[in-house]
């Protein structure tokens, strides 16, 4: 009986500890969401017949207007593009705004690409993502934007 009492006691303590560490009791406005503009990750995927970009900042992507997708990054920051679901390979081509890069995007293995931003106060690059899916060898291209901007 003592063993059962100990188990119940430990269980109740662990439930109490979990409720203390939960953020459910804090109003959502009080939980500060940190957005990292120094190290940005953009994941490229192909889902339900559509190309998608999801970045670590949560910027909205509209597959009907991919050229409106904009990622913000701090001066001197780094960006990494990675392949997600159903992307076989991709490469990044800078169409305009090369001056915002310290190191231009470099594809290491056709599924990861890295770039380092210059220490400029602001700027914009338009770039193309040329990708193939696991369903086809045909190449597709979309043209999002990358904005270099100081953030507080």
Features from the language model and the residues they span:
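Bacterial Sec-dependent N-terminal signal peptides
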Residues: 1-28
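Intrinsically disordered/low-complexity terminal segments and short unstructured peptides
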Residues: 2, 20-22, 34, 42, ...
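Short beta-strand element of the conserved SAM-dependent methyltransferase core
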Residues: 22-23, 44, 53-56, 91-95, ...
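N-terminal edge beta-strand
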Residues: 32-74
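Hydrophobic beta-strand residues in large extracellular and virion-surface proteins
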Residues: 42-44, 51-53, 79, 90-92, ...
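Residues that cap or initiate secondary-structure elements
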Residues: 48-50, 77, 87, 121, ...
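Contiguous segments within soluble domain cores/interaction surfaces
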Residues: 67-106
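Extracellular/periplasmic metallocenter environments
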Residues: 108-152
């Amino acid at each position: 009986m003592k063993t059962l009492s100990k188990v119940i006691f430990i269980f109740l303590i662990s439930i109490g500890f979990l409720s203390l560490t939960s953020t459910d009791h804090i109003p959502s406005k009080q939980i500060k969401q940190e957005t990292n503009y120094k190290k940005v990750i953009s994941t490229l995927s192909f889902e339900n017949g559509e190309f998608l970009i999801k970045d670590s900042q949560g910027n909205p992507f509209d597959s009907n207007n991919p050229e409106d997708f904009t990622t913000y990054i701090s001066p001197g920051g780094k960006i990494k593009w990675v392949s997600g679901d159903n992307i076989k390979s991709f490469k990044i081509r800078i169409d305009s705004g090369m001056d915002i890069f310290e190191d231009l995007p470099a594809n290491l293995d056709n599924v990861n690409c890295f770039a380092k931003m210059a220490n400029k106060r602001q700027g914009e690059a338009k770039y193309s993502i040329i990708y193939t899916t696991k369903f086809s060898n045909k190449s597709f291209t979309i043209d999002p934007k990358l904005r270099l901007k100081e953030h507080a």
